[in-house]
């Protein structure tokens, strides 16, 4: 890969994503400007607070460029709030809340409750070899509806969807970057390289 992977660095746990990419030998840059975005071979939208992320993207004049780049085919991976930002529909968003879109899914924010209801679990993840993926759910969203073009990558034991892919877009409800899990980032890098 000649160009680095950009990590949206307006808010959230972007540093942890950069550390994970570094651990697998992939160069990354923090995306805060349009110039940063244009240097990126792919984009990671980290966990954080989706409403704040939207406001900051607008304030930094990045909202429309991000929306347009994703729509034009920039490989993009969203975790937790990043999944919310990639969803075409946010079921319980605050008035005026919208994401960049791209994934034909409907998501519900904070579907598992508040910070105190956070949990970790091991789960299967399509496209990842080896053992189960160790996943941390922190005020996580859930995918409640998937469109015809959506590939479900992961579910909880009760069937709730926590990982999806549509073409070169991937979104997950959980945080692999905080558990030391690198295989999902490796999968995303393979999507960027494809």
Regions found by a protein language model. Name each.
Residues 1-59, 63-71, 182-194:
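N-terminal beta1-alpha1 cap of cysteine-dependent amidohydrolase-like domains
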Residues 10, 81, 174:
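Cofactor-binding loop segments of dinucleotide-utilizing enzymes, especially the Rossmann-like FAD-
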Residues 18, 87-89, 147-148:
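Short, well-ordered secondary-structure micro-motifs
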Residues 28-29, 76, 169:
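Hydrophobic anchor at the start of a short beta-strand
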Residues 45, 78, 172:
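Redox-cofactor binding/interface segments in oxidoreductases and associated redox assembly factors
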Residues 50-124:
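Cysteine-nucleophile active-site neighborhood
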């Amino acid at each position: 890969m000649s160009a680095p992977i950009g990590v949206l660095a307006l808010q959230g746990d972007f540093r942890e994503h950069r550390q994970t990419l570094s651990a697998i030998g992939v160069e990354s840059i923090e995306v805060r400007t349009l110039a940063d975005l244009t240097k990126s071979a792919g984009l990671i939208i980290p966990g954080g607070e989706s409403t704040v992320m939207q406001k900051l993207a607008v304030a930094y004049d990045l909202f429309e460029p991000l929306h347009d780049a994703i729509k034009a085919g920039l490989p993009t991976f969203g975790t937790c709030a990043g999944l919310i930002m990639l969803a075409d529909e946010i079921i319980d968003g605050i008035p005026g809340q919208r994401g960049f879109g791209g994934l034909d899914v409907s998501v519900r924010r904070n579907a598992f409750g508040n910070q105190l209801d956070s949990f970790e679990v091991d789960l299967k993840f399509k496209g990842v070899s080896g053992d189960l993926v160790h996943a941390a759910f922190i005020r996580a969203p859930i995918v409640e509806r998937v469109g015809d073009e959506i590939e479900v990558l992961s579910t909880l034991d009760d069937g709730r969807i926590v990982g999806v892919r549509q073409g070169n877009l991937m979104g997950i409800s959980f945080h692999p970057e905080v558990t030391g899990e690198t295989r999902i980032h490796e999968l995303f890098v393979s999507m960027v390289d494809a």
